[in-house]
Amino acid sequence: MISVYSISLGCPKNRVDTEHLLGSLGVAVQPVEHLSRADVVLINTCGFILPAVEESVRTIVETIDDLSGLRKRPLLAVAGCLVGRYGAKELASELPEVDVWLPNQDITAWPAMLAHALKLEGAVTPGRLLSTGPSYAWLKISDGCRHNCSFCTIPSIRGGHRSTPADVLEREARDLVAQGVRELVLVAQDVTAWGEDIGAPHGLATLLERLLPVPGLARLRLMYLYPAGLTRELLGFMRDAGAPLVPYFDVPLQHAHPDILSRMGRPFARDPRRVVERVRDFFPDAALRTSLIVGFPGETDEHYAALTSFVEETRFTHMGVFAYRAEEGTPAAEMPEQVEDRVKEWRRDALMEVQAEISEELLAVHEGTRQQVLVDAPHEEWPGLHTGRTWFQAPEIDGITYVSGPGVEPGALVEADIVETRTYDLVALA
């Protein structure tokens, strides 16, 4: 057995990569809560945007400092998008204290590389060590991206789109549910693109046909649905499939004005209203989440006003807004008409205020209703209180439901009365 202290930065896809690595070393792995008790310290980094790069480097440096005072120093391994973006050779010259760099070019090789560094003798076998508890798990269905958005570094870091075969994903889904997982959350850079590169006859629907019948699965949630991929055929399949597929749509629109979408390199998304209308044609009561970028090069006051009007009209259930940052190596970083930081930040904050009012109004409708709540974990401070989620709340990015009452325990799916609503959260009694 080896003990591991792990830090996973960035998106859920990184978390899945960490879990696969730790579950595939061919020996029993014991997670520990302090690096002084570890045989190996693993940092899975993010490098998508500059603040993520800075956080990753800071985390590595702080960890090196913490390790320097230990009598028995664990092996330090660093993986993830920071390595993919800057390369192991360049990073090693700046941070020689790191023992192992795990590059993004072949994530499947990580277990063998780390096992070799640890001098482990057992055969490396595919597996996964869950870190999210019994209620939910992320299921990464593909890696890389086929799009060329002008602001994004992901294709250069993660490479082109590569789908994981359906039989592999079905087997993993069954294993996760057998461990007690109630909700599977499908993630990728573009979930709707699954199957295009491996000849799946009906694209994503082919995969869903394999996953939906998994015995014991209570919820199947789809994230990162690209606008162009939400075809009428896919939406019709999803409507007819019904439970455990939840009518929750995470669609990263990024903007609403065609001028800005064209500059972003997203011509397939130039009519976001039509995308929203199409979803609501099939799912009138759908929960809609989106992410938007403000302050993109060339965004004028008029463009921003149009975006604000779009948000007010559309009334998303959940929304994230990001101030544009110029990323080295991307076409957008070289564009003229860069927007001042103070303007970008004001636009972000103002748009989030608009969304806060919308979210509060939409959640208030649920007060007095009865909802199924999937219980995630005990509250850290209040005995008897747990945190969980309704079908319209995705883990870690949306609001939560505070729930208490008989039968409330992690992994339980309970019927509960919504007794109070807040801007983003609910309070419920089972």
Swiss-Prot record:
Residues 131-361 form the Radical SAM core domain. It catalyses: L-aspartate(89)-[ribosomal protein uS12]-hydrogen + (sulfur carrier)-SH + AH2 + 2 S-adenosyl-L-methionine = 3-methylsulfanyl-L-aspartate(89)-[ribosomal protein uS12]-hydrogen + (sulfur carrier)-H + 5'-deoxyadenosine + L-methionine + A + S-adenosyl-L-homocysteine + 2 H(+). Residues 364-430 form the TRAM domain. Binds 2 [4Fe-4S] clusters. One cluster is coordinated with 3 cysteines and an exchangeable S-adenosyl-L-methionine. One of its GO terms (molecular function) is aspartic acid methylthiotransferase activity. InterPro entries: Elp3/MiaA/NifB-like_rSAM, Methylthiotransferase, Methylthiotransferase_CS, Methylthiotransferase_N, Methylthiotransferase_N_sf, NA-bd_OB-fold, Ribosomal_uS12_MeSTrfase_RimO, rSAM. [4Fe-4S] cluster 1 binds at residues 11, 46, 81. Its main location: cytoplasm. Residues 2-119 form the MTTase N-terminal domain. It holds the Pfam family Radical_SAM. GO terms for biological process: tRNA modification. Catalyzes the methylthiolation of an aspartic acid residue of ribosomal protein uS12. HAMAP family: MTTase_RimO (MF_01865). Belongs to the methylthiotransferase family. RimO subfamily. This is Ribosomal protein uS12 methylthiotransferase RimO. The gene is rimO.
